[in-house]
Amino acid sequence: MVCCLWVLLALLLHLDHVACEDDAYSFTSKELKAYKQEVKELFYFGFDNYLEHGYPYDEVKPISCVPKKRNFEDPTDQGTNDILGNFTITLIDSLTTIAILEDRPQFLKAVRLVERTFPDGNFDIDSTIQVFEITIRVIGSLLSSHLYATDPTKAVYLGDDYDGSLLRLAQNMADRLLPAYLTSTGLPMPRRNIKRKWDVSEFPEFLETENNVAAMASPMFEFTILSYLTGDPKYEKVTRYAFDKTWSLRTGLDLLPMSFHPEKLTPYTPMTGIGASIDSLFEYALKGAILFDDSELMEVWNVAYEALKTNCKNDWFFANVMADTGHLFVPWIDSLSAFFSGLQVLAGDLDDAIANHLMFLKMWNTFGGIPERWNFSPPEFPPLSPLERSGAVALDNILPLEWYPLRPEFFESTYFLYRATKDPFYLNIGVHLLKDLKQRFKSNCGFAGFQNVITGELQDRMETFVLSETLKYLYLLFDEENELHNSASDVIFSTEAHPMWLPQEVRSNYKRNAKFNNSVYSSHLEICQKKDREQAGENTLSQRIVGFAKSIFHKGPPDEEATDPIIDYTIDTELPGTCSIKPHHVIGDEFWYSPMLSNFDRLFEIDSRFAATLIKPSHMHNYNAIELEPGFYNRWSNPQFSTCLIPPTTEIFELLFDLPGYHQLNPLMLENKTITFETFGGRSRLKIEKLQIYQIDYYGDLITASTFQDVSRKDIFSNACDAVASLYSPTYLYRVVAINGRILPRHGSVQIKKHSPVLTSNGTREEDEFKMDGIGINDHSQLMLECTPIINLFIV
């Protein structure tokens, strides 16, 4: 007994010594408060330097400590003039960060400065700016700041010290931007002069002939909130029409090209994805559905997300594909797509969010930031020598756009994943991001991102999102006690990280009293809607004529093109992907571990799979992987479980079905790991694994002879496989490992109901209606591909 007590005392003394030796990475409340304070100090360092060296202009240059001004000499300088309208945009965009810091004195001081800057309460400034960017940065911040100033439950509530000036300014800017929607289609022009809001004669044609999907659709979110707060529905009606009209331009695969001519509706590029030019449409479909309790927006999100998973989803990211075919268009992803993991968290798709976020962590480990564009596939041309492949020449080839201006998207997703999982893995990332901001990006008068991640050259610019988003999300990551984390309101962050909520009284008043009385915009919408009805009638008549002709001259259904099944065999360049992590954080009864370090057995798969394009620049050679920081790894990993899968040796390819009927959203996942499809129409993309004995499979398991026992190759509807069915067992089999972007768990299967397009309702094929060469069904109800069973794909 005495011996046991001595052992226990020694253990306690050892643990106390370890704790005192290094409190870092324990993530106690004391430690998190220290990190939070450091972020707060960084924010005020940047903000105060802007006020001293940049105000009243739009930005401050962080290296040279002079204002960054609008380019008045060159009106075509889009990179500058689209955002810098000569209206102190850094001041306005930073207001909500001060509110989130819960710093009432500084919030009131900043609001007063805005009021003094615009004493007449209007933006009567001769500047041509981009409608979308000013909506999210100016109108969005003013609306959110107004909500903070008028909400008695918030720490920065201003009460009698505030008279609604920010809301009036937001409405004034909106009134200057809204004429951009007075086009023949109701889709907005990309730019507007906010002084001469009705005059478009000054714009060079090339500045007005293309608008991206995000810019045409997304202002709906801020403008709808403005309608709720002012009681004037014109903002909601006009911009919601544009959102719906933009969504209607999608292809038959429910994918949207990234940009259009707003008058002619012709697409400028066939490409689609989740990054720049389209990101906010998906974001505001889901966030608008939640904030406005809007089932139609939720349907847009569900359809769009399913289409993205089916056509764009790879193991670790969403690729840019052709909107009409779903085929890969370019072999790069951009930095803005890092936001999508956070959106997936909001949608409840946590497993996939975790995997997608990891891709951007590996980029940060490699480049010290997220390059604007990164090639995930090595370029074939020009051929490079071994020396070139390891140096700057190779980096030039894999980074089409090499800058990183401290964009917030990776910070944003890290924050949302931590809130959803409470995994210290994400706190550790935040600690390193904080360290990088202090040691690598903090400059004389602000924060300078990379002009070139290859050379490490810094950029003498601090865009407004550094203070309004990047530092805000980092602060919230460490602030467990922030009022936003304990609010009874449904708070939604805008795409510019401005918190939005709608008090019930505001909702009720708007629904009860709002009247659309503005004749200019109501008449314009009526004209646009009339054109839509006429166009729909012409399309319907055309379809009837074509259908009638086909019914006379062709045997089969009226729309042959839509019902011809297509099977496309493509070799997948991606190796197998991720598996789900355990939702809890405790292994055993005594110690806490990081689920990512202890359960996620593909944590380092990206490093090997993308080694050809994750090449460290010379200035990053001493930068260690964030997840392998010794202080963090030694404390939070569980040696018993922290293992990696053996890399698979099986061949992976894709099977693409284009079938008649409709695609089923959200198929049912049963407790026995079976995904069930009631219908199997539309497009489906199956990732197929070719199984051969003694290979390592997708899940890291050895394939044994037992897999090949009791295999049937007899097609119950055809004699095409009779010859091979009577011979020896097959040398390989097939297995589905992912379907429409959903990775099947180990021992998972797929069931397709018999009434789906693969079979008719009575279980027999109708050759006149449907024929797929190479597809059969055996007497185990397994689908067969060229007489080889897909052992986990059943027709039931």
Curated annotation (Swiss-Prot):
GO biological process, one term: carbohydrate metabolic process
Function comment: Alpha-1,2-specific exomannosidase involved in endoplasmic reticulum-associated degradation (ERAD). Delivers misfolded glycoproteins to proteasomes. Forms a complex with PDI1 to process unfolded protein-bound Man8GlcNAc2 oligosaccharides to Man7GlcNAc2, promoting degradation in unfolded protein response.
Entry keyword set: Endoplasmic reticulum, Glycoprotein, Glycosidase, Hydrolase, Metal-binding, Signal, Unfolded protein response
A cellular component annotation (GO) from this entry: endoplasmic reticulum quality control compartment
Top-level EC class: hydrolase
Positions that bind Ca(2+): 495
PANTHER family: ER DEGRADATION-ENHANCING ALPHA-MANNOSIDASE-LIKE PROTEIN 1, ER DEGRADATION-ENHANCING ALPHA-MANNOSIDASE-LIKE PROTEIN 2
Annotated EC: 3.2.1.24
List of catalytic residues: 372
Superkingdom, taxonomy of origin: Eukaryota
GO molecular function list: calcium ion binding; carbohydrate binding; mannosyl-oligosaccharide 1,2-alpha-mannosidase activity
Name this protein carries in UniProt: ER degradation-enhancing alpha-mannosidase-like protein 1
Lipid metabolism found in the keyword field: no
